[in-house]
Amino acid sequence: MPNLKDLKNRIASVKSTRKITKAMQMVAAAKLRRAQESAEAARPYAERFNAVMAGLAASVGGSDSAPLLLRGTGSDQVHLLVVMTAERGLCGGFNSNIAKLARVRANELLAKGKTVKILTVGKKGRDAMKRDFAANMVGHVDLSGIKALGYANAQDIARDVLGRFDAGEFDVATIFYAKFQNVVTQLPTAQQIIPAAFEAEGESDEVALFDYEPSEEAILADLLPRGVATQIFSALLENGASEQGARMSAMDNATRNAGEMIDKLTIEFNRSRQAVITNELIEIISGAEAL
């Protein structure tokens, strides 16, 4: 039979844990609202930017004068995987799902004889990827000291990636992040950013409505680096909302599980205490009968 003191200590411990998880749930809920608003506010700009770039890219086509960021190196031998996760845990499967998608892609590429290089953004992604791909790691971006991610942070990451591309370190770059759907659903996503892969929305004839000065190629050469930064910034915002949604959901589950455990331990405590009282009564009655 469990010791009553041990049961009381366990109940007190679980109650303390429940207070912590409840507080974390409330903090995540507050952060989620801000992160979700930021992600949703950025989507129209990103979508419109994507549409403009798609039109420009379509007008240039496969021209030899097209910027290198658009036409690529002509090879897909070396791949850079930019794995974007959180700095902290306690957010369900958010980090592990992104890392899992990146690992699957890395293994597929390696099986095809491709060279894989990995750049991580966020501590959890680095920890997850280095277990299996330590030899493939080429860099890490630490965001632990940043309270609110901004476009400047995306520009820093973009400069790192673009610098590696200009140096001929890779042919194709893909970012991995979680696209926010709702509080309980965050979709692990892989998106190619180099060579630029823009998808046009609407009729393709819309491209002919615009005349560009000085030229499509010149405008693309200026906008494509910004496009990389914009895509990375969008991924950071989606990740931020997804992380808080996953943490809120995970802490809600933890709080409910703690409540159920407290109920079970309380029942066990009451039964044990009742058994102790019953035994004491039996001893008293037995002693009285002996007299």
Swiss-Prot record:
Keyword Calcium carried by entry: no
Topology term for the membrane: Peripheral membrane protein
Domain of life: Bacteria
One GO MF term: proton-transporting ATP synthase activity, rotational mechanism
GO CC field: plasma membrane; proton-transporting ATP synthase complex
HAMAP family in the record: ATP_synth_gamma_bact
Oligomer and partners: F-type ATPases have 2 components, CF(1) - the catalytic core - and CF(0) - the membrane proton channel. CF(1) has five subunits: alpha(3), beta(3), gamma(1), delta(1), epsilon(1). CF(0) has three main subunits: a, b and c.
Protein name: ATP synthase gamma chain
Organism expressing this protein natively: Ruegeria pomeroyi (strain ATCC 700808 / DSM 15171 / DSS-3)
Name of the coding gene: atpG
